[in-house]
């Protein structure tokens, strides 16, 4: 028995899967379909998506395409990078961080159009179904969610193609379309499937679509300077940039120098292990730069606490809990830590490497050469270290005198 749905907002990419879903919703739910397409920097011409939706019978007023690049970077990517968030030590969360923004607009458009449900094209095996739906329920507990991949029997590409042909859905292949399952936005490109399902099979050289092969990158390194204010990058080489402009420029620089390639096996929230390859050129530069400016502006205790909390914060984003109270609590703590993260970082980019070569903060540095110098100084009494060491060694001394062995 299908849910009683009169109108549904579909997260629509214009591809085979979501085009089939569009017709399937009409056929199986007998409902009106509204489409929503987010421009989050996937570098794709979105005009054909609107034309395809019209061709499939969607009313002009029911087609929504929004440029969310600035909001995506400003309100999602930058807060995440203020935390130095990395999942399982390597993954920069490029797919994970985009899902809550899409959920937000699915819910907003549903309210605007008086729709009673939303729908997405995520499969029943992956993390995205969780991310989309947790976000939607957090923002509207009364929303209905339709996930066709968990309902229908179109469980193979052959069946999808047959359904598309039967319903007059254009299935012409895009020129140069990747055979891999891909996700792209302004932060990254991900690749899954095919030969990558064997974790011991090296990716094909032509799989990588964004970054230069590090071996073929320029033989001359390039030095850049990023300026930070309250933990956010605001200027590149002296030029002030908006958040999405900053990430775009860093992407171009990183891609040119072969920076940001990653091949990992990760633990999905739904329980299985999955192999994925990622290109995150600008994000890789930002992470290195942000940690560098933090190194001279954040107090030791605050920095260590932040590093202890980061894996939990990253896991919350990976698992789809962006709109949770615990993520908001952690964000407040993280943002408080960024109050004095102001200054400039110099980096050298060379054949896949991001090398920090300088950092300064004229207003907020905690680095004081008078205390740390190896030369003679007049501010630090080295004799003080003796008592400090004895107090920290006291438990070892007591245990040793009591016959305890390590």
Curated annotation (Swiss-Prot):
Keywords: Amino-acid biosynthesis, Arginine biosynthesis, ATP-binding, Cytoplasm, Ligase, Nucleotide-binding. L-aspartate binds at residues 123, 127-128. It is found in: Cytoplasm. It catalyses: L-citrulline + L-aspartate + ATP = 2-(N(omega)-L-arginino)succinate + AMP + diphosphate + H(+). One of its GO terms (molecular function) is ATP binding. PANTHER family: ARGININOSUCCINATE SYNTHASE. Belongs to the argininosuccinate synthase family. Type 1 subfamily. This is Argininosuccinate synthase. It comes from Campylobacter hominis (strain ATCC BAA-381 / DSM 21671 / CCUG 45161 / LMG 19568 / NCTC 13146 / CH001A). The lineage of its organism: Bacteria, Pseudomonadati, Campylobacterota, Epsilonproteobacteria, Campylobacterales. The gene is argG.
């Amino acid at each position: 028995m299908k849910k009683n749905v009169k109108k549904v907002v579909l997260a629509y990419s214009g591809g085979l899967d979501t085009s089939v879903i569009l017709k399937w919703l009409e056929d199986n739910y007998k409902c009106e379909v509204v489409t929503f397409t987010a421009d989050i920097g996937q570098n794709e011409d979105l005009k054909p998506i609107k034309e395809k939706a019209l061709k499939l019978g969607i009313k002009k007023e029911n087609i929504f395409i929004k440029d969310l690049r600035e909001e995506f970077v400003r309100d999602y990517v930058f807060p995440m990078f203020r935390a130095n968030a990395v999942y399982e030590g390597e993954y920069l969360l490029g797919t994970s961080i985009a899902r809550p923004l899409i959920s937000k607009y699915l819910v907003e458009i549903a309210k605007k159009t008086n729709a009673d449900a939303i729908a997405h094209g995520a499969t029943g095996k992956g993390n995205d179904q969780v991310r989309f739906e947790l976000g939607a329920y957090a923002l509207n507990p009364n929303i209905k969610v339709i996930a066709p991949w968990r309902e229908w029997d179109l469980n193979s590409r052959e069946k999808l193609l047959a359904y598309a042909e039967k319903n007059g859905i254009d299935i012409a292949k895009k020129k140069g379309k990747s055979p891999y399952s891909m996700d792209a936005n302004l932060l990254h490109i991900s690749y899954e499937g095919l030969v990558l399902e064997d974790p011991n099979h090296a990716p094909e050289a032509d799989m990588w679509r964004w970054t230069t092969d590090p071996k073929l990158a320029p033989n001359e390194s390039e030095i850049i300077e990023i300026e930070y204010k309250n933990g956010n990058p605001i200027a590149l080489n002296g030029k002030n940039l908006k958040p999405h402009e900053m990430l775009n420029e860093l992407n171009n620089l990183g891609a040119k120098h072969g920076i940001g390639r990653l091949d990992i096996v990760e633990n999905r929230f739904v329980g299985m292990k999955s192999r994925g390859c990622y290109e995150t050129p600008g994000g890789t530069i930002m992470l290195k730069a942000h940690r560098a400016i933090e190194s001279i502006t954040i107090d030791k205790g605050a920095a260590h606490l932040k590093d202890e909390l980061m894996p939990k914060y990253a896991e919350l984003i990976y698992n789809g809990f962006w709109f949770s109270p615990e993520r908001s609590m952690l964000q407040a703590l993280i943002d408080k830590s960024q109050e004095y993260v102001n200054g400039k970082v110099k980096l050298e980019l060379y054949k896949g490497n991001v090398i920090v070569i300088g950092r300064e903060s004229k207003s907020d540095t905690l680095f004081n050469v008078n205390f740390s110098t190896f030369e003679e100084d007049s501010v630090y009494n080295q004799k003080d270290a003796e008592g400090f060491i004895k107090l920290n060694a006291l438990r070892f001394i007591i245990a040793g005198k009591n016959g305890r062995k390590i």
